[in-house]
């Protein structure tokens, strides 16, 4: 859901950035100084405090940001915002992105236009609610791993480059058996990421849907399928596999799953509250990021 909001304003701002990304320390420092000039209280997440001089500012562990801040500003690319979402969503802390990455589907504001933040802090912004996925890996009656994903839950080959055989169930109804290099279960947010390179459809962020995208399937008739986001997806790894595939959430963690194990994916109970400037337009973003502005050459 996308809505223009005139309030509340933001007064306690937490800053986060990923170390090792070019330009992030400089932008964090400039952002800190700008927020101080606006008489906002600035809180530094612990890693951000290592990158800039924040000797006079409060430093807070990532998992405690909500106790001190009412907005989290992330400096970096889409990967940095994905990482921040894993921290902010369970705390229900709104997130705004400053783009220092390559694409910037999720990080709207260029580093040379930090003055746009002033209007946002004063309560003039668009708030977009994006859902996440929750993935659970089970072997027998044991929960091996559990995690959330803003983009996707992905089944990947193991250490050997072999196809994986698995069964797909939706709401306990059998859908199909597949042999493929893997499977991407994507949100609308993730539909312009890994799933897009796998041939998946672009889903508008306001759709309450997710897509299942097979990776290099053995059967040419295997195609992506879009399902209701309220569905529960179960992937059963065939006992016939002689290698253990991996399950990944947003590419951040990777867990091995034995043949016979199950991967359950469903909608996570907390969404991401993503903050945009008032002139944000999703289709403008698609045109710019996917080079749709280029006209086809005349023959």
Swiss-Prot record:
Task: Enumerate the Pfam families for this protein.
Answer: NAD_kinase, NAD_kinase_C
Cofactor(s) it depends on? a divalent metal cation
For this protein, what is the EC number?
2.7.1.23
Catalysed reaction(s) here are: NAD(+) + ATP = ADP + NADP(+) + H(+)
A GO CC term assigned to this protein in UniProt:
cytoplasm
Query: Which Gene3D superfamilies does this UniProt record tie to the protein?
Result: Probable inorganic polyphosphate/atp-NAD kinase, domain 1 (3.40.50.10330), Probable inorganic polyphosphate/atp-NAD kinase, domain 2 (2.60.200.30)
InterPro entries membership = ATP-NAD_kinase_N, ATP-NAD_kinase_PpnK-typ_C, NAD/diacylglycerol_kinase_sf, NADK
- From the UniProt record, which GO molecular function terms apply? ATP binding; metal ion binding; NAD binding; NAD+ kinase activity
Give the family from UniProt: Belongs to the NAD kinase family.
Which named protein is this? Answer: NAD kinase
Query: Which source organism does the UniProt entry give?
Result: Coxiella burnetii (strain RSA 493 / Nine Mile phase I)
